[in-house]
Amino acid sequence: MLVIHDRIEPQAEWAAELHLNFEARSKSRLRCFSAENEDVGLFLQRGQSPLRDGEFLQAQDGRVVRVCARPEKLMHVTCSSTFELTRAAYHLGNRHVALQVGDGWLRLLDDYVLKAMLDQLGATVETIEAPFQPEHGAYGGGHHHSRAGEEDFNYPPRMHQFGVRK
């Protein structure tokens, strides 16, 4: 098994490639197969951004591995005006949808409920097969309810925390 722990700077040459969809690139722990059909175990540092197309990893045995975003079924969204596209992005953002933003278009994973919403908003939705590279997010850490790392966020008590008085 090819065991991988480290992300590295871009390299001119590599020994293997991993062709992964967005969900697989978002995991820090993953068992998969390389394009060369070798068993691979990813053990990356937790809490990091998803792997990106063209990123490089180093295996324990020293080999360099290139990450490739595998094409997947996406919705390609366009609108007749910038306002309508912005409105579509706003509504998708309210649903915490992973979203790839381009010049005059949006892309998201195929979902019939979101397609119905976009249709109601007047967007043009086309189903395509393409690599998915969504925005990582403004705060980088993702949305979670874990208490891990809580000491980094020392906020004053809120009004509705029972038993807390000023």
UniProtKB/Swiss-Prot annotation:
GO terms for biological process: protein folding; protein-containing complex assembly; urea metabolic process. Keywords: Chaperone, Cytoplasm, Nickel, Nickel insertion. Gene3D superfamilies: Urease metallochaperone UreE, N-terminal domain (2.60.260.20), UreE, C-terminal domain (3.30.70.790). Residues 135-154 are annotated as: Disordered. It is found in: Cytoplasm. The keyword Metal-binding does not apply. Its main location: cytoplasm. The keyword Chaperone applies. One of its GO terms (molecular function) is nickel cation binding. One of its GO terms (cellular component) is cytoplasm. HAMAP family: UreE. Belongs to the UreE family. Involved in urease metallocenter assembly. Binds nickel. Probably functions as a nickel donor during metallocenter assembly. This is Urease accessory protein UreE 2. It comes from Pseudomonas syringae pv. syringae (strain B728a).
